[in-house]
Amino acid sequence: MNPWQALTSAGDSAVLLPLIVWITLWLIVPHESRRDGWRWVVAVGVCGGGVALSKLLFMAWDIGLPGLDYTGFSGHSAMSMLVWPTTAALLTRRANVSWRSVAIGLGILLALSIAISRIWLKAHSVSEVILGSAFGLLICGWFQKGKPVAQQVSVRAVTLLAGMSLLLVLACYGRVFPSQHILKQVALAISGHDMVFSRQMPLP
């Protein structure tokens, strides 16, 4: 596996979806963080739903952004920009502001690397990656703004989050979730067309 493929695998739904579910449970089960859990559900729903909608509009009805090489937001870019910085922030809730900022910065750097890998592997155009990354970062910022103070989280809870997250990533890394195939089937069903719309020119 080349480095770009290794990076892009870290942004696949096969890795991110189990991590999202685990973070949801980690936040919702304890009463004191339940509000945050529901905010997280909203953030994931808006991000994932926005990506899916942007792709379905293009695949089903050829609705895109005029003047851009665009077929919908890059899902890897958007979801990575939401999940990885958020994971870093949750893991460092007990740390001081400086360490939390460094951790979130590293999460954003990983998400940016995943986004760049999508361009390098010719999976998305530059516009799709930029728009997807900006969309995910915007939603991540909204979620982080409502995050409770660090002192409310126990060492045991953070250790549980870190350990299970690591196990999930190790178990799911390298797998590919058929999200694009699912969206194509949905686009065909809702449009009534025999084929979905696709990019006319190959990526440079």
Predicted features along the sequence, with ranges:
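Terminal transmembrane helix and immediately flanking juxtamembrane interfaces
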Residues: 1-57, 93-103, 109, 113, ...
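Histidine-centered catalytic micro-motifs
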Residues: 68-82, 121-132
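Internal transmembrane alpha-helix with an interfacial aromatic "cap," most often the third helix
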Residues: 83-97
